[in-house]
Amino acid sequence: MDLSKAYDCLPHDLLIAKLEAYGFDNDSLQLICSYLESRYQRVKIGSCKSTRRKIKIGVPQGSVLGPLFFNIFINDLFLMSLESEICNFADDNTIFACGNTIQEIVIKLENDLGLLLDWFSKNGMIANPEKFQIMFLGLSDQRCLRLNIEGKKLPATDTVKLLGIQIDNKLKLNKHIHELCSKVNQKVSAFARLNTYLSPDQATKICDTIILSNFNYCPLVWLFCSDAANDEINRAHKRCLRVLYQDFESSFQLLLSRDNSQTIHVKNLQKLMTEIYKSVKKLNPSYLWEFHERKEVTYDLRTKDLCKLPKIKKRYGSESLSFRGSLLWNTLSDNIKQSPTLAAFKNQIKSWTGDKCTCRLCL
């Protein structure tokens, strides 16, 4: 669900009223009022300036308190009684529903979207139904599917972009990876034109921070991608290394050896192991712990650092992070798993190559 300038639309008086309802005392409310009020803005075009106007809505952008105030303001949205489930990250809201028939799902979504749009309107927020993205999972042809929102028929699409990740109606990420590799290849082309003017150290820094860093966004989401998608990633990675070292003859493995690095897939496996270490040691948010739980043992056995393997019924489940990650974690040496600190674990996992991984990309 698309919101226009969500952080700039928060009414100050309604925000203060909600803070008071949540139990903020009078001194705290006065301090927050002082923080929000007495702010002015004006427009300058050339040498001409408009008169100053008081800002009555919105929270200061770039501040630490801005996102906190927004989360408090929108918190009662999730107290509504909906038939659908709602997920939120900052001002990005997504609802999803399931049912026995398409018509049942459509009715649930239309009813709940009506309630949500009413909430946005009453709370001074501007929603753009025309920009809402709608997708029905599992259906090959969605062209005839529509949702009626505020009298407008909005069509369903085959793919949606959720927090920067392209997902299709089969929950495949091939399109996202294709666009990601296209972006990397464009940067490699620009890098090739500049490389002759750069020192080796400068070229390496550009390669790592501007080009290959594109693969660092949500890598665990597309970690166990298709063979074709993984091949596309490797081709982009190889092209980058060839330009970096001006070596257009060596194989990908020789280039990796020269660069003293691993494939993107192995790097992502290392990141997965790091996240599991954090879950086992309770270093990350508690809602992630259930995905990788330690086996409960009574005695001090070698299995005390192993993770439970979730039960799976289909092959699809065997490619999930919870199953594949726990299975791979259990193959790590005790020396790595029992690292005393996160820094020590990260240092040791760098040399790990995932040689015992049994996913289809490693076999």
Identify the residue ranges that each predicted region occupies.
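Conserved catalytic palm subdomain of right-hand nucleotidyl-transferase polymerases, strongest
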Residues: 1-20
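Active-site palm subdomain of RNA-directed nucleic acid polymerases
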Residues: 67-97
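Short, charged alpha-helical motifs in flexible N/C-terminal segments and linkers
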Residues: 117-136, 206, 229-293
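Basic, alpha-helical interaction scaffolds
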Residues: 155-221
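Amphipathic alpha-helical
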Residues: 285-324
